[in-house]
């Protein structure tokens, strides 16, 4: 029986795995089997942490807005509720950025809402 030369498909698959794992440390970037395992583990972590990142950023934005509005005597929930009642559709990222970089603007927004509510 004559010897059959192998094709390139397995080599191409391993090359793709090696390129993905090239920044891993130690044997995780050099050995095919461990690189494959670490690639699967990395993809699981990436998928899981995308959802986790959304939750953590939302918590951070709420904490920033709450800290800024409490200095003005308004609670976070009151501010968000009044924004929705006035149909000002701001997500939590925008007021958090305003609270971080331009606190007076957030004070003006909350005072305007409070003033209209009293009238």
UniProtKB/Swiss-Prot annotation:
It holds the Pfam family Ribosomal_L20. The keyword Transmembrane does not apply. One of its GO terms (cellular component) is ribosome. Keywords: Chloroplast, Plastid, Ribonucleoprotein, Ribosomal protein, RNA-binding, rRNA-binding. GO terms for molecular function: rRNA binding; structural constituent of ribosome. SUPFAM superfamilies: Ribosomal protein L20. One of its GO terms (biological process) is translation. It comes from the Eukaryota. It is found in: Plastid, Chloroplast. Binds directly to 23S ribosomal RNA and is necessary for the in vitro assembly process of the 50S ribosomal subunit. It is not involved in the protein synthesizing functions of that subunit. Belongs to the bacterial ribosomal protein bL20 family. This is Large ribosomal subunit protein bL20c. The gene is rpl20.
């Amino acid at each position: 029986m004559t010897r059959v030369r192998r094709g390139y498909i397995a080599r191409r698959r391993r090359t793709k795995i090696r390129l993905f794992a090239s920044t891993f440390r130690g044997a995780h970037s050099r050995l095919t089997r461990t690189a494959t395992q670490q690639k699967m583990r990395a993809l699981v972590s990436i998928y899981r942490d995308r959802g986790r990142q959304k939750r953590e950023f939302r918590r951070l934005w709420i904490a920033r807005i709450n800290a800024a509005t409490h200095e003005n005597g308004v609670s976070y929930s009151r501010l968000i509720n009044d924004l929705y009642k006035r149909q000002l559709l701001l997500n939590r990222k925008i007021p958090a950025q305003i609270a971080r970089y331009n606190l007076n603007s957030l004070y003006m927004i909350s005072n305007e809402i409070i003033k209209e509510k009293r009238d």
